[in-house]
Amino acid sequence: MSSLFVWLNRLAISAMQRSEVVGAAIVMSIVFMMIIPLPTGLIDVLIALNICISSLLIVLAMYLPKPLAFSTFPSVLLLTTMFRLALSISTTRQILLQQDAGHIVEAFGNFVVGGNLAVGLVIFLILTVVNFLVITKGSERVAEVAARFTLDAMPGKQMSIDSDLRAGLIEAHQARQRRENLAKESQLFGAMDGAMKFVKGDAIAGLVIVFINMIGGFAIGVLQNGMEAGAAMHIYSVLTIGDGLIAQIPALLISLTAGMIITRVSADGQQVDANIGREIAEQLTSQPKAWIMSAAGMLGFALLPGMPTAVFVIISAIALGSGLFQLWRIKQQDSQQQADELHAQQLAPEDNGYQDLRRFNPTRAYLLQFSQEHLNSEAAESLIQHIRRLRNRLVYHFGFTLPSFDIEFSPALAADEFRFCVYEIPLVTATFAVEQLAVRTSSIEIHLADGESDGQIQPGQAERDEHHWCWLPPQHPLLQQEDRRCWNAQQLIMLRMEQAIHQSGAQFIGLQESKSILNWLESEQPELAQELQRIMPLSRFAAVLQRLASERIPLRSVRTIAETLIEHGQHERDSAALTDFVRIALKEHICHQYQQPNGLNVWLLTPETEELLRDSLRQAQSETFFSLAQEYGINLLNQMRSAFPPYDNHHALILVAQDLRSPLRALLKDEFHAVPVLSFAELTSNVAINVLGRLDLQQSPPELQENDPCMNYAY
């Protein structure tokens, strides 16, 4: 036995090495089959081989990842068609001469006829009609359309390959391979368009051969062999039907193979193990609701009178179970995907050892960070919604676009910690999701000095910038006083977030955002936009908008801003001076923005202070600044801390002369970003002024402690 396998192996290797000789021998054998009579034993072998080849082809078509994987199919289709016709000729010769075409033909005929000749003929005709009118006709039309569309799409695909190569998206060898595949694809569908004519002709030839066998056999049996008409009709009908079936069944399988190949839709870069069976299963099970609705329909059929209830109930149960299983599987996949995303979030990109990073990851503009313990918590969701409402309100009222928020749940954060990062640099670090209430430390200092803390008063953490706050339980006696202001953790975060967004928002007014505003102006007032672009470049326009946004001046009055820049931009190039001109033009908006029911609450500078500041003005290349002695700077900051305590409700501002406004704002913006600095030129004629006090730099400053942060303040 082993020697037989060795011999067969050698024979197969030799045949593969001489495949062109084997192919030529097969073609010549098919031709000789049409001429030379074959013994019935050999006919049985060839019929079985024909059925095996057709079965192999249809299974192979199921596993093809794409039509191009079987580019030789048109040639195979031609050979199998010729082989089947040659086999039909051989069996016809044996039927007409010897009333015997082998065991397979007779077995097929007797099995299908089953004692009823009419039934056998009907079944045979149905198979033939299905093959000819349904499968062959449809495949032929699909082949025609596919060939036409493939040829029409070739120039576009060629240009796409060339553009990808020029852009560096693919290498030269990849472009060469794609061009070769494109050429093969066009040849394949063009050849399939012609090869389907073979299938159509084969079906027609099968019908003709059946009629020849039946009529010719009946005539030969009655006229030449002297058989009775009934016996001749029975014998030749059985053999004819058997012969037709052994030809039509492989023809039907080949037609199905051709139809499956040319109707296959495959995407570029499809996985190697993809096959049509898997794709059909995945796509049929992608919509579980359809299965559930079908189950309901089958249940409705089961309720109809006279219907087989059990059959429809079983089918309905199977469909319902399949739909519910698919829903469960989708839910499991979603849960797994969320778990994978959470796992990816927990790992820093540089610590990810599961996959290689292949794309550019820019820093995130706005990032909200929570502890991992708050994933899917109501407190985190509520805070995120409040922060987004705050952002949207600022975008609406101030007219500039802010980036959207990225949310991250980090295991590195404490359970009660919240962070707001700008370009991944923490700007706000706060206490989050605690039951205690926050009060200003200055408001309870007297109680702390008297020793009333009783262990329930927790000072705020300095690393969270909460050294001015204390945390108390909600039922603490100090919170029962009516004039005592307190905030919960979320309210305090919102106060700090509003200032942080205002403080960081100006850096997002760049060239792109300024161009968007200019595009809007072009659509509404094209002449104004054209003149503005003629007067100044986009970079200067963006610098003015950025300065306005940094001082919380709304940008919605685009027309006023543009007209002012056109008026003064012809002789002024400094963006700070242009910003002052725009502020004066927007004085009604500014006064309305800061006006309280009793007017503007302002702090003024003493005349001596104004003179001192004016004498210390220095002009740099791009800006004007104060060159103050250290004691004056310390004195100014201490007076500012006293006049403008954080989160004060007076909504006060500083009112100074026009030449001092911009440098004073630049001096105070780091610590007192929320304090507006206005000039007298920015006041309207009808606004009321409520003076709260005056700042005097010549007052003696208080003694500095060793660790006072003002000791090293640089001016």
Curated annotation (Swiss-Prot):
GO cellular component term of the entry, any? plasma membrane
Q: What are the record keywords, sorted? A: Cell inner membrane, Cell membrane, Hypersensitive response elicitation, Membrane, Protein transport, Transmembrane, Transmembrane helix, Transport
Tell me the GO BP annotations in alphabetical order: protein secretion; symbiont-mediated perturbation of host programmed cell death
Compartmental location: Cell inner membrane
Highest taxon, organism lineage: Bacteria
Spans traversing the lipid bilayer:
23-43, 45-65, 69-89, 115-135, 203-223, 241-261, 298-318
Asked if the Swiss-Prot or TrEMBL record annotates the protein with the keyword Cell membrane, the reply is yes
What topology in the membrane does the UniProt record assign?
A: Multi-pass membrane protein
In this record, what's one Pfam family? FHIPEP
PROSITE patterns in the record:
FHIPEP (PS00994)
Family affiliation: Belongs to the FHIPEP (flagella/HR/invasion proteins export pore) family.
Q: NCBIfam families of this UniProt entry?
A: hrcV (TIGR01399)
- State the protein's purpose: Involved in the secretion of harpin; a proteinaceous elicitor of the hypersensitivity response in plants.
- This chain belongs to the protein called Harpin secretion protein HrpI
Gene that this polypeptide is encoded by: hrpI
